[in-house]
């Protein structure tokens, strides 16, 4: 037997040991434990604002920490900063590449970033002395498209890429300080833990991984999806996360139990999920779908509690405000809608 075969065998044995250990931990299901909890009831949200101004498909949006301003990125080659209270555009930033896939608002509110098919992550300073928005740094280093980016602070940002890696950047120097390798497919999405010490990533290898930001190590790998994971989002307490996939399911994974807790699916739902987000308490899971709808799931019961219907094309992105008071959805119909 060749050395490679021996190693393969060893890896299989280790995988089986992990599977058995996980089974031993799974002494109850989430459905059993939440059986006595009242259902959340029918969730009916209304469109409170429609943000009009983009001229093409919207691909991404991200709320600022003030729960008022948000940034959106569109195929029209613009980043727009919106005031969600008044629907006014605070800034419209022309991009060098219109093939944008992600955008992010820094926690401080001083910067926004975006990225896409040009493999570069430009950082824009919103608070210049002159009052104009300008590129403060362009982060180049990925060898594939940028699928997602999230600021840790004004000088650090994490990116995920189609080159199968994630990276932590020092914005001032423009250098990758850590590269997170381990996925075997395009990384599509990332979500920072509430304490910012770790993050999760979802990829086209149908797995999700938990990473330690400072050590650059993969801590855990979660499998279960049958197709690409397009979206990922941490549970508000940081102990679990949800994923959305092309296999038409959302799933809830628990870090401490090291396994899947729940599947959110319905026989009538046969299209992929583009985006996921939790309500402030975590009781509701919102998911955007290719069929133009956004479904609201009861996280504990896996029942569908409501639908946000109003877009005329695929819901490509969604986000819940930090204060938990509103949801924004962005769509290929070129509009953003604010619901509550």
From Swiss-Prot:
UniProt GO cellular component terms: cytoplasm; heterotrimeric G-protein complex
PROSITE patterns the UniProt entry points to: WD_REPEATS_1, WD_REPEATS_2, WD_REPEATS_REGION
One Pfam family recorded for the sequence: WD40_Gbeta
GO biological process: G protein-coupled receptor signaling pathway
Self-association state and partner proteins as the record states: G proteins are composed of 3 units, alpha, beta and gamma.
Similarity remark: Belongs to the WD repeat G protein beta family.
Name of the protein this chain belongs to: Guanine nucleotide-binding protein G(I)/G(S)/G(T) subunit beta-1
Natural source organism: Xenopus laevis (African clawed frog)
Originating gene: gnb1
């Amino acid at each position: 037997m060749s050395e490679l075969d021996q190693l393969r065998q060893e890896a299989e044995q280790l995988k089986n040991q992990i599977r058995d250990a996980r089974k031993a931990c799974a002494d109850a299901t989430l459905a059993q434990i939440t059986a006595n909890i009242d259902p959340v009831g029918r969730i009916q949200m209304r469109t409170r604002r429609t943000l009009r101004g983009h001229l093409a498909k919207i691909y991404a949006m991200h709320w600022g920490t003030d729960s008022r301003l948000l940034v959106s990125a569109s195929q029209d080659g613009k980043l727009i900063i919106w005031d969600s209270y008044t629907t006014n555009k605070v800034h419209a930033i022309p991009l060098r590449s219109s093939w944008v896939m992600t955008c992010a608002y820094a926690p401080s509110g001083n910067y926004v970033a975006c990225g896409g098919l040009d493999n570069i992550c430009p950082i824009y300073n919103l608070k210049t002395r002159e009052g104009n928005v300008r590129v403060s740094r362009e982060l180049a280093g990925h060898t594939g498209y940028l699928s997602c980016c999230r600021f840790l602070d004004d000088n650090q940002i994490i990116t995920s890429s189609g080159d199968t890696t994630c990276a932590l950047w020092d914005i001032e120097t423009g250098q990758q300080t850590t590269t997170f390798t381990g996925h075997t497919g395009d990384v599509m999405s990332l979500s920072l833990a509430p304490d910012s010490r770790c993050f999760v990533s979802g990829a086209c290898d149908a797995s999700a991984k938990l990473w330690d930001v400072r050590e650059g190590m993969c801590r855990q790998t979660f499998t279960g999806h049958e197709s690409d994971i397009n979206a990922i989002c941490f549970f508000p307490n940081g102990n679990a996360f949800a994923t959305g996939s092309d296999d038409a399911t959302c799933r809830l994974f628990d870090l401490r139990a090291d396994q899947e807790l729940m599947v959110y699916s319905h026989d009538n739902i046969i299209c992929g999920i583009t985006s996921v987000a939790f309500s402030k308490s975590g009781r509701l899971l919102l998911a955007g779908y290719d069929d133009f709808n956004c479904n609201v799931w009861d996280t504990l019961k896996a029942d569908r509690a409501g639908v946000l219907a109003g877009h005329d094309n695929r819901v490509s992105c969604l986000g819940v405000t930090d204060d938990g008071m509103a949801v924004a959805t962005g769509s290929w119909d070129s509009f953003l809608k604010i619901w509550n």
